[in-house]
């Protein structure tokens, strides 16, 4: 059995973070991972998102039909289950198609037999998060009769996840490169690329103008949104917030925009587009994510904090409508002296989304007031593909 080694006699020994990354890569490619807890219990786990009907059958046969489906608390709640630790649902009598419906269908048949999840399931779910997969797990406890089938699989001790998580909050991000880039309407900027965290993803800081780093620096912490930032989606206000945020940084004499690789509130682009499908049938953005097993906001701001510290910034004016973001940055040691609203546009397509952010995520926007103060004769700039757009003033108080 491929048991993890925690002492490294040579300079290229594995670390907890590297073992977590390898486990995430294995799940993403549709292979099982073995988890070991403090009592040496072994569980084989696979991510349903990367399974096929064939691999499901192979897994079931290998574990002697002792496998179960683990659903997160968010998805369990959708199914009407009171399961604050998530729910394990036995699969011995369920087909692959039935399993998929139970994990993802909007109105599935509710399971009658289940037990609460435990630390193994929480660990497996965390690995799927690292892999940007949907958090539904097919797993089974192993015995000496069944573990031989998984002899070549990646093994991960649960303590590795704890160690990696603890290290993520203290490990500095490496500054990889920086260079000037001229931007339309903004003049010369500087793009600074950092690398760090689990999966060693590249994150970008954009320095606008010449801010005084000894004072409270204007900062926009912006999570990537492919559909809104790049393609101008009308379903959200992300693209507007990006562009208006950059313009505000310039107007304030300079600042920093942190562009974080956290698509879909940290769930990934595939999950985001899947959630759009649920929104098309009437669910709001938070309930749509819950259908897939996600909480209201899976984003983490450790990377943002590390980047600010690397730039020598500890005091900021935060451009955001989200008080929770202020709280998280303050909890990490960043002094947020002021929150400045970032106002975008309301369209017929994104008004429900914005109201949901206010009513369910605590964002600070008076949407009705903003609509009332923006009524004026329509001009050609206020239409997009024939759709009327309600412009919100780019300045003012939210």
Swiss-Prot record:
The protein's required cofactor(s) are namely: Zn(2+)
Q: Where is this region: Disordered?
A: 375-398
Identify the SUPFAM superfamilies for this entry.
RibA-like
> Which residues participate in Zn(2+) binding?
225, 236, 238
Enzyme Commission number(s) from the entry = 3.5.4.25
Q: Which reaction does it catalyse?
A: GTP + 4 H2O = 2,5-diamino-6-hydroxy-4-(5-phosphoribosylamino)-pyrimidine + formate + 2 phosphate + 3 H(+)
Q: Where is this region: Unknown?
A: 1-172
Transmembrane parts of this sequence: none
The active-site annotation reads: 297, 299
The cofactor binding remark recorded in the entry reads: Binds 1 zinc ion per subunit.
Positions contributing to GTP binding: 220-224, 241, 263-265, 285, 320, 325
Pathway(s) this gene product operates in, as recorded in its UniProt entry: Cofactor biosynthesis; riboflavin biosynthesis; 5-amino-6-(D-ribitylamino)uracil from GTP: step 1/4
For whether the record's keyword set contains Hydrolase, the answer is: yes
Q: Which UniProt keywords apply?
A: GTP-binding, Hydrolase, Metal-binding, Nucleotide-binding, Riboflavin biosynthesis, Zinc
Annotated GO CC locations: cytosol
Q: What is an example of a GO molecular function annotated in this UniProt entry?
A: GTP binding
GO annotation terms (biological process): riboflavin biosynthetic process
Q: Does the keyword Transmembrane helix apply?
A: no
Ranges where the record places region GTP cyclohydrolase II:
173-398
Q: What does this protein do?
A: Catalyzes the conversion of GTP to 2,5-diamino-6-ribosylamino-4(3H)-pyrimidinone 5'-phosphate (DARP), formate and pyrophosphate.
Supply the NCBIfam families for this chain: PRK00393.1, PRK08815.1
Q: What family is it from?
A: In the C-terminal section; belongs to the GTP cyclohydrolase II family.
| PANTHER family reported in the protein's UniProt record | 3,4-DIHYDROXY-2-BUTANONE 4-PHOSPHATE SYNTHASE, GTP CYCLOHYDROLASE II-RELATED
Protein name, entry field:
GTP cyclohydrolase-2
Q: Which gene encodes it?
A: ribA
């Amino acid at each position: 059995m491929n048991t993890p080694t925690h002492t490294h006699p040579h300079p290229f020994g594995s670390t907890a973070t590297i073992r977590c990354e390898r486990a995430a890569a294995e799940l993403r490619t549709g292979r099982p991972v073995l988890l070991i807890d403090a009592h040496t219990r072994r569980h084989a786990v696979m991510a349903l998102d990367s399974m096929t009907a064939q691999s499901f059958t192979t897994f079931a046969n290998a574990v002697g039909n002792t496998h179960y489906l683990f659903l997160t608390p968010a998805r369990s709640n959708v199914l009407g289950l009171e399961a604050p630790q998530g729910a394990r649902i036995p699969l011995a009598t369920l087909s692959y198609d039935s399993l998929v419906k139970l994990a993802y269908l909007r109105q599935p048949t509710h399971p009658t037999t289940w037990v609460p999840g435990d630390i193994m399931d929480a660990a497996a779910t965390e690995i799927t998060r690292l892999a940007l997969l949907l958090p539904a797990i097919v797993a089974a406890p192993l015995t000496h009769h069944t573990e031989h089938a998984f002899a070549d699989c990646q093994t991960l001790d649960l303590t590795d996840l704890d160690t990696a998580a603890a290290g993520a909050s203290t490990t500095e991000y490496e500054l990889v490169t920086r260079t000037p880039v001229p931007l339309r309407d903004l003049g010369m900027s500087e793009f600074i690329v950092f690398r760090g965290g689990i999966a060693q993803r590249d994150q970008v800081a954009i320095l606008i103008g010449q801010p005084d780093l000894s004072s409270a620096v204007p900062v926009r912490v912006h999570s990537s949104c492919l559909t809104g930032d790049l393609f101008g989606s009308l379903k959200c206000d992300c693209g507007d917030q990006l562009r208006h945020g950059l313009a505000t940084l310039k107007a304030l004499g300079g600042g920093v925009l942190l562009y974080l690789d956290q698509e879909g509130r940290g769930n990934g682009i595939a999950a985001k587009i899947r959630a759009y499908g649920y929104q098309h049938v009437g669910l709001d953005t938070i309930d749509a994510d819950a259908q897939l097993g996600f909480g209201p906001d899976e984003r983490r701001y450790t990377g943002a904090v590390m980047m600010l510290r690397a730039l020598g910034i500890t005091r900021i004016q935060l451009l955001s409508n989200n008080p929770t973001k202020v709280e998280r940055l303050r909890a990490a040691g960043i002094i947020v002296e002021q929150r400045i609203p970032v106002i975008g546009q309301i369209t017929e397509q994104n008004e429900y989304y914005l109201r949901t952010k206010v009513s369910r995520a605590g964002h600070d926007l008076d949407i009705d007031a903003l609509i009332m103060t923006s009524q004026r004769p329509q001009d050609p700039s206020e239409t997009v593909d024939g759709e009327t757009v309600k412009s919100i003033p780019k300045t003012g108080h939210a």
